[in-house]
Amino acid sequence: MSSASVNQQACDLTNKYRYKRFTTTLLFRDLRFAKGAAGSGDSFPSFDLVATNGDHLTNSVVFGDKPVLLVFGSMTCPMTASAAPSLLQLYDEFGDRVKFIMLYVREAHPGEHFTQAETMEEKLEYARALKEFYDIPWTVAADNVDGDLHRALDPKPNSAYLMKNDGTILFRSLWAADKDAIRQALDAAAAGRVPIRQQSTALFGPVVRAMGKVQEVMERGGPQAVRDLWRAGFPMALAGRVATLFSPLSPDQRGIAAVLTLATGTVVMIGVLGAWVMT
């Protein structure tokens, strides 16, 4: 293969990773782990991350004294917003026995206010914004602009990985908002045990609860982020908009209320149409 072909392939990978617009294809890819992606029993890939304070985090620095929970996140990810409160609670519970790291990866829903970072300086700026916005007390770091570690694992927007102190993956969760599954895994790892469950791929609960954060987070990204979600993920955009009608409720409850409202409306509409057809 010629050097020109290799360079073109590298450029294509970069463009796909640092996408400018959210698409339906990306939405469906985010709903499950890729076949063959790193999981329980695998060694964590090599990495060299930069923390928001400028420190470099490598395998030898991160692993050694205690288990490590690493979570993906970004400023325009509703799942990150939904997971933040439960992660803060888990940190209060396990932070003295498990090392927590938030990895800023790439913007889930890029827009005018938060475009995809094109330089390491910009990526670190976004990582600092993430740490400040959610008042994260543990280490927040950034992958490089091409997302080498993110892609080596499985480039999901808000998954979580729990490792032994030697870097062996014990558990992974598709969504960091799956608080109960992550707590059980943390409890086992903190006690030196292997978690009974090696992964969580729960979809309905975490995603439904996150609907209460969708509109707020899309607006944070900018008008483009809002438009792209309506185009690429209409049901999610609609649920997020309906959730704003339940503002007195907590974000989790707003998401549940929105989905129940839409489901009830759909059933009623089907019933009315059925009755009309039968007349």
What are the roles of these predicted feature ranges?
Residues 1-68, 176-279:
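Non-globular targeting/processing and membrane-anchoring segments
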Residues 81-134, 148:
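Structural microenvironment flanking redox-active thiols in thiol-disulfide oxidoreductases
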Residues 56-88, 99-104:
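Short active-site neighborhood of thiol/selenol oxidoreductases, capturing the structured segment around
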Residues 69, 78, 90, 160-163, ...:
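Conserved catalytic-core segments centered on acid/base and nucleophilic motifs
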